[in-house]
Amino acid sequence: MIHCGICGKAKTADVQFICCHCINGSPAVLLRDKMNLLILRQEVEQLKTAVEDQLETGFAGEGQLGRQLQKLDIYNEKRRLIKLRQRLQLARNKVQLKRNKYNELLQIMSTNGYLEESTSATDSIDLEEQAAEESASLDTLSHILARNQKQLFAELCRWFRIRKSDEDDVFSYTIWGLPMVNLKNGSELDPSIMVSSMRYLQQYLQLAFRIWLFKAICDKPIENDRNIIENFTQLIYDTLDILRARKLVSKSVSIRDILIRYDLDGMIYHLSQNKYLSSLDDASNSYPPTMQNIKQLVMSMIPSI
């Protein structure tokens, strides 16, 4: 049998017990319990503040949660673009079928003179109207696709935090807060930072290709700093490929001149800003931007390797 520790009143529960009358009539007991309650509330508020800070940091994009959510948004948007592209292709096929049918009917009407002119004219007008409607629908889908691509690519650039740095004279651009590697000064970076920077660039280019060109590029992961030449070669080749597809460089661009003027980091930054890169042209196409030619340039521009 449990009794009150002050008045001795019986209590059957197997817990430490003080009756309500004694709590209210004993200042020492009441003060102790109130102090415990205040301490408990303070601890709860501290835990609540810590949880809110963690959630705010995570959803703001600085923590792991924010990164995963942003990555999920990009992949969801990419799926929407793929579906939109499929709808666009179906609309194009439908328009082409209408045009083929229209041409076939025109040929039949021209070879069979017994068809009445009124019927031929009516059929021709109907087919032209259908073709015009399908073309308008195709144009609408094309505009929607282009707009969504621009929005998704802008979000991609914000996610990777590609920025120009005015404080560093050696590395003018950053990605995810790290110096963006370049041919001129890449050897000055710590090997681990260089590899991390290259990995971010590779991930950025992979997603950019899927947004603009709906195709994947070389997904061989960059694991260490032993194949620096191959890593630089692949990154430069992919960057030039998407720059040419986006018409941000001349079709006959001189790869030597553009690397001297902008280097890899400058090319990536101009791509993120959708800015045209002016350079000399290789009109004779004597040095096309192939993997082998780019590799030779990389080897000549990094004398320390």
Swiss-Prot record:
GO terms for biological process: macroautophagy; protein transport. It is found in: Preautophagosomal structure membrane; Vacuole membrane. It is a peripheral membrane protein. It comes from the Eukaryota. InterPro entries: Autophagy-related_protein_14, UV_resistance/autophagy_Atg14. Residues 34-147 form a coiled coil. Keywords: Autophagy, Coiled coil, Membrane, Protein transport, Transport, Vacuole. Disruption phenotype: Still forms preautophagosomal structures (PAS) in proximity to the vacuolar membrane. Component of the autophagy-specific VPS34 PI3-kinase complex I. Required for cytoplasm to vacuole transport (Cvt) and autophagy as a part of the autophagy-specific VPS34 PI3-kinase complex I. This complex is essential to recruit the ATG8-phosphatidylinositol conjugate and the ATG12-ATG5 conjugate to the pre-autophagosomal structure. ATG14 mediates the specific binding of the VPS34 PI3-kinase complex I to the preautophagosomal structure (PAS). Kluyveromyces marxianus proteins are shorter in length and have a more ordered secondary structure than their S.cerevisiae counterparts, which might contribute to the superior thermotolerance and solubility. K.marxianus could be therefore useful as a new model organism for further elucidation of the molecular details of autophagy. Coiled-Coils at the N-terminal half are essential for autophagy. This is Autophagy-related protein 14. It comes from Kluyveromyces marxianus (strain DMKU3-1042 / BCC 29191 / NBRC 104275).
